[in-house]
């Protein structure tokens, strides 16, 4: 973009990042690719005293599975016995909040759920060729796997809606020292989601229902990790209370429905 200066370095090479940053100071620093506690420890070393706000991209999959009560709020316990990815995100959050409490490190934690855009369709699972393999099967009238009986609730947020909430948190002093999820208000079952996909392609939906636990076992044998993404995420009933993000960012009002997106 006009007016932007691009600084390039490998974030995993801390010395190279320090050299690239020089004496720069930032209103906001965001890390979308921090996945372990070691990653955020490095970020604290890099951005403490350099950024007025540090935004960590966590995950709504960190919320308790199975969820004890709906809707999910930011105070819902964080515990996911099925997915190491989620447990690592929880460890990152715990470390960052400790740094906030003890040192005033200006962290904001964002927990996205399933976020999509025009280049990425919403499906429950797919093979090595990605979501397009599933869409090709729908278009060809072939069976596609839907976990369980397809009646579990899911939330998929269009990137345009997510961006409104995310940008509204940047430089927002009320967002410091807190965690917030950014999700749409629309909840749909997987049956409804796949029906939308089939309708968009003008094809009939031929659903093959398979138990999520069975998929996890079979996937493991074939070299796929379905246990975390399914049992620890997409196979669980989820519905989010967006009161907090709407309070922090009054302009946040999701507008893109699944059918539109």
What are these regions (language model features)?
Residues 8-28, 35-42:
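Conserved Rossmann-fold cofactor-binding substructure of NAD(P)-dependent oxidoreductases
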Residues 59-84, 98-103, 120, 126:
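Active-site "gating" loop of Rossmann-like NAD(P)-dependent oxidoreductase/epimerase domains
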Residues 85-89:
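Active-site YXXXK catalytic motif of short-chain dehydrogenase/reductase
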Residues 93-122:
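Conserved beta-loop-beta element that borders a ligand/cofactor-binding pocket
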Residues 126-134, 147-170, 177-178, 260:
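Substrate-positioning beta->alpha
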Residues 168-230, 242, 247, 256:
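Mid/C-terminal beta-alpha module of Rossmann-like enzyme folds, strongest
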Residues 253-261:
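Amphipathic terminal alpha-helices
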